[in-house]
């Protein structure tokens, strides 16, 4: 009888814990995202080389601030809300030199594991010196040789096209 009583108590505790969504894991909000370069450049390349409108939609959905910064501030093609901005953006990159640059950047930076490893190592060293610094989001882009690094409030954009050339 005593065992049955213990089983009922344990079952009730498990039921109440799951009903209250009791977590045995650490708070998910406090876990930092892994530090790596987000591949915005791949979406950009897909749109600019194939004209795939779904890639542009995904750029606007997944990277709205980055897309606005690229189109409005870096390339200065107009505002993101212009009716014809997608066509203007696509036509800007139809130059054969820029198309070759996109293809070269895509080939050169197909794998960024070494860059991500160095980034983690460097940022960990920076956090040792400045423990209160918040981890920004790093993303790669193609910027038509305009800027090498773009700094936002909580993001750092790396223009891969500026890092092409002889090693």
Which residue ranges define each predicted feature?
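Bacterial N-terminal signal peptides that target proteins for export
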Residues: 1-8
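Acidic/His-rich structured neighborhood in mature extracellular/periplasmic domains
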Residues: 90-167
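N-terminal mature-domain "stem" immediately C-terminal to a signal peptide or N-terminal signal-anchor/transmembrane
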Residues: 21-91
């Amino acid at each position: 009888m005593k065992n049955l009583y213990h089983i009922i108590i344990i079952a009730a505790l498990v039921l109440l814990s799951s009903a209250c969504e009791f977590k045995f894991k650490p708070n998910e909000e406090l876990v930092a995202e892994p530090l790596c370069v987000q591949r915005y450049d791949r979406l950009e390349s897909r749109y600019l080389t194939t004209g795939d409108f779904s890639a542009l939609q995904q750029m606007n959905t997944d990277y709205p601030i980055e897309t606005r910064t690229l189109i409005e501030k870096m390339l200065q093609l107009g505002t993101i809300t212009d009716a014809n901005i997608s066509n203007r953006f696509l036509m800007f990159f139809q130059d054969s030199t820029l198309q070759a640059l996109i293809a070269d950047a895509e080939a050169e930076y197909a794998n960024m594991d070494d860059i991500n490893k160095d980034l983690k190592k460097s940022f960990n060293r920076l956090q040792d010196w400045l423990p209160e610094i918040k981890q920004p989001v790093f993303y790669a882009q193609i910027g038509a040789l305009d800027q090498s690094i773009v700094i936002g409030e909580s993001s750092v954009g790396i223009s891969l096209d500026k890092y092409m050339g002889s090693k």
